[in-house]
Amino acid sequence: MIDFWLAAGLLLLAALAFLLIPLLRGRRAQAEEDRTALNVALYQERIAELAGQQAAGTLTAEQLENGRAEAARELLADTEGSGEERSSRLGRAVPLVAALLVPLVALGLYLHWGASDKVELAREFAQAPHSMEEMTARLERAVQAQPDSAQGWYFLGRTYMTQERGADAARAFERAAELSGRQPEVLGQWAQALYFSGGKKMTAQIKALADEALKGDPAEVTTLGLLGIAAFEEQRYADAIGFWERLVSVLPNEDPARSAIQGGIQRARERMTEAGQTPPAPAAPAAAGVTLTVKVDISDAVKGQVKADDSVFVFARAVGGPPMPLAVKRLTVADLPAEVSLSDADAMMPQLKLSGFPQVELVARVSRAGNAISGEWIGRGKPLSTAQSSAQALTIDGPDQPQAARP
């Protein structure tokens, strides 16, 4: 920041030099004007002297006129160029006023449209915060300086959540959702903030946000976790188990949250047993003949238009059945080519499993924004029997286009 102001000061000095040099030169013109005034006085004195001599009879009228002409020529010679010097006098105030206004106007314009606040923020974020409150204050200043930054609003919302400021977090996530095109991850965080700030009550708005998030990304982890919590709080333990088992199936094995979620599943089973209900059977790999093996790849043409960390969803959906995927696996472009297995263990809903439908369609979709909505790169397979045992090749080779309604 010091370097910036030093450079700005040097530039200002250069600008003032251009303005003040003419003003300093004007001082020399003052001496010239004084000399001109003296010459005029001498001229007038000479004319008066000639007139006196003519009145005394020592000069003729012709000699008087010759004397006046000679005095006028001398005055003209002495005052040559004085007109230009006098014009410089008139302009002397202009550079002086400009010299004062230029830095003031420049400073005002810079403070209004400049990026001094962003430079200061960048300097702040280069240093580790001393507390969570300091980090929050920095993020608040950041979104004020860049109100159209979806990432800034998202991280501010996450920070508010760590401070149990759910209402503030909900407003931040709402703004992030508007700026990000309503990405599923942001919608899930927004729904979660509304849920916890509203006394853990499921509302129509929260349900709509959760549905929208899962429609875009069936494996959106925040939404699955939230729906499991809401179901548990409402003593819908079977639903809670279903949501949490779906969540566990998409989390990496090394994710520390897995053990906590599995603990929640176990508590839900115990509550069902205490209430005299039969818990659902633990999720297990599907029996032989219901597992579909898919070899997923991406064409060179599409590979050049996506990023290595873009999400890839591989899923199966029923032919002539509901549009909800029956089983889904999540990869990244960097994982391709890859071989995955889809089975009842990957079911999105307990009542919708591969084994419940005779034919399915395999789909692999690239999601730049981490969701599975239309408009992404896609590869589709032909309808096949769920009893198919051979590996199926699936290549992502073109943009997603709306399909005609399936029979």
From Swiss-Prot:
InterPro entries: C-type_cytochrome_biogenesis, Cyt_c_biogenesis_CcmI, Ig_CycH, TPR-like_helical_dom_sf, TPR_CcmH_CycH, TPR_rpt
Keywords (A to Z) from UniProt: Cell inner membrane, Cell membrane, Cytochrome c-type biogenesis, Membrane, Repeat, TPR repeat, Transmembrane, Transmembrane helix
Pfam families the record matches: Ig_CycH, TPR_CcmH_CycH
Main localization, broad class: membrane
Biological process terms in GO annotation: cytochrome complex assembly
Cell location: Cell inner membrane
Function per UniProt: Required for the biogenesis of c-type cytochromes. Possible subunit of a heme lyase.
Protein name: Cytochrome c-type biogenesis protein CycH
